[in-house]
Amino acid sequence: MLSAIWTGFVTLFLCSFVQGAPADNVLPSAASFYVPSIPGIIPNPDYRLQIYAGHLPAESNKTLLASNDVTAHLYFVMVKNRRVADKERVVFWFNGGPGCSSFDGLMMEVGPWRWDGQPEGKESFIVKEGGWEEYTTMVFVDQPPGTGFSFTSTDQYAKTMKDAQWHILEFLRNFYQVFPEVLTMDTYLAGESFAGQWIPYFADAILESSLQIPLRGIAIGNGWMDARRQYLSYLDYSLKMGLIKDNSEDWKEVKAAHDRCEAHLEKLEGDPIHIRECGSIIMKVINQKRPDNEKGEKMCLNMYDVRFTDTSPACGLNWPPEMHAITHFLGRKDVVRALHAERHPGSWVECRRPVHRAFKDGEEESSITVLPRVLSKIPVLIFAGDQDLICNYVGLENMIKSLTWNGETGLGTVETQSWSVNSTATGTWVESRNLTYVKIFNASHMAPFDLPHVTHDMMLRFMGVNFSSIVGGSAMIPSSLGDAAKPVFVGGHLPQPSTPALPAGKTPEQDKAMWEAYYNAGSAALVLVLIMLVIGLFIWYRRRKSRLQLPSNQSGELAEESIPLRSEMEDRGGNGVSNGGAWKGKARASEPVFEVGDSDEDEPSPYRKPDGGGDRNV
């Protein structure tokens, strides 16, 4: 009796002080996601960053899961805008795959910092101009579950676009509960490569949902969207770019693969995302015979930037060179802790192959079938770096020519305009019936990596930013579209901005987040002390009671709590390159099968079932 009373007292005492694990429908506060600093990111006093990061559930609390399944969580990093133009805007950024982390976009393309060039182990990153966060809040999302720092059970990886749509809607539902102010911002989705599939499907789901998100447009860079046209573009692109010579032996091999693909497409129904029978075309292009390098290694064409070569069979998978430093950086425990990513066991990898393989099982219709429906509701930007082979501009232009939307096929008779940034010819620009197509000169598969200021200007124009309302930073870079030049104020004639640039130091919002975080940390420490005190008293009481009682002949053995998940993960270097070959890039160059999106090695999963069952389809 006394034991029961004591147990009840302890329970009530603990409940009065301890905030336990939140229920499925209880989310952490915004302050708990606040990132005051990141080790290895060299701050710039002129560019004050507000960063929030962490995991949010990507499943409804009504979802029926097995007892040993993990609730899917997506990981995000939000960088709030440093300056405000005419209105608040937010861009959700997605990289490709399937299974590739949006840290590619954050660390190398549209984020606020760049690698300093130091070797792996000594790397740091410098905050500098060119990031899209200057005038726009950026949210980088690792999806589907299992990608980057996101996690789920291995048998719960997304298998279809519907799975991925559902996860992103649940994530957004929770995201807006934590950050309700973002729901009032003009919203855009952007990304590249296989995000050409994700983004139209996500936009369609958002527009049909009850979330009431003010989605104003989507932007896709060098996207994989229309397999029928894009596979058949490799021959034409290679000839235009001088990668092969007409009627040469190389041309004959590429042409034979092209003809086999074309014959297969004539019999094929529907618009699938991948067509295995067509994958050999690009392999014929990149694997033309070339002289060995000085180390005697075989060389091939970089499929993401045809200005470069790479060792075989990587053929671009070793590019960009920043990836090794980024992978090492994101493997540091202090960085993982600062980014609130500890819940993800094991090392970060750029692209996770089991996620990639699980998704490919579905018989999926390409996003080209969804795009006309999206175009009937919101503007769409398709941009293409002209040095990319794998998702080249020729294929995208052929796609647009054959696409029917808003009552017509193709762009029609609209005029293509010249576009320049900083007095340099940058590309061409054309708009028709909600579709904007931009070809960017001297840019690769990752156009923002090559030309950050150029792609930033492009995005500001697409979002309709009033250039007269912004000053400082990129506002000082001249640009023009056709005959219309962006207003640039110089000398002593700068007007007062509609909303001034954010000053150095912390804003009231940051101070609030910081003090709330301190308060939570102090409260947690106090609670921990009280818990230890109560537990100590309880143990003392139990030991004293056991000395006064007769020994029990009942077995005191307790079944160990069933732990449904195993958290081991082999560390194979974390660089996305397996012992058996190169897997870093957006395709598997060792196989004659075209796949947009990186794939890492077959690593043991952190969420493997306790019966020893392996990853699905691995």
From Swiss-Prot:
Q: Which Gene3D superfamilies match?
A: alpha/beta hydrolase
The entry's family comment says: Belongs to the peptidase S10 family.
> Mind listing the GO molecular function terms for this protein?
serine-type carboxypeptidase activity
List the lineage, top down: Eukaryota, Fungi, Dikarya, Basidiomycota, Agaricomycotina
Decide whether keyword Iron is in the record: no
State the name under which the record lists this protein: Pheromone-processing carboxypeptidase KEX1
What membrane topology is given?
Answer: Single-pass type I membrane protein
Pfam families in UniProt: Peptidase_S10
Q: Active site annotated at which positions? A: 193, 388, 445
What is the main EC category here? hydrolase
Residues in the Cytoplasmic compartment per record: 542-618
UniProt lists compositionally biased (Basic and acidic residues) regions at 605-618
First and last residue of the signal peptide: 1-23
- Region ranges (Disordered): 551-618
Enumerate the Gene Ontology biological process terms: apoptotic process; proteolysis
Enzyme Commission designation:
3.4.16.6
Top-rank taxon, per record: Eukaryota
Q: Which SUPFAM superfamilies match?
A: alpha/beta-Hydrolases
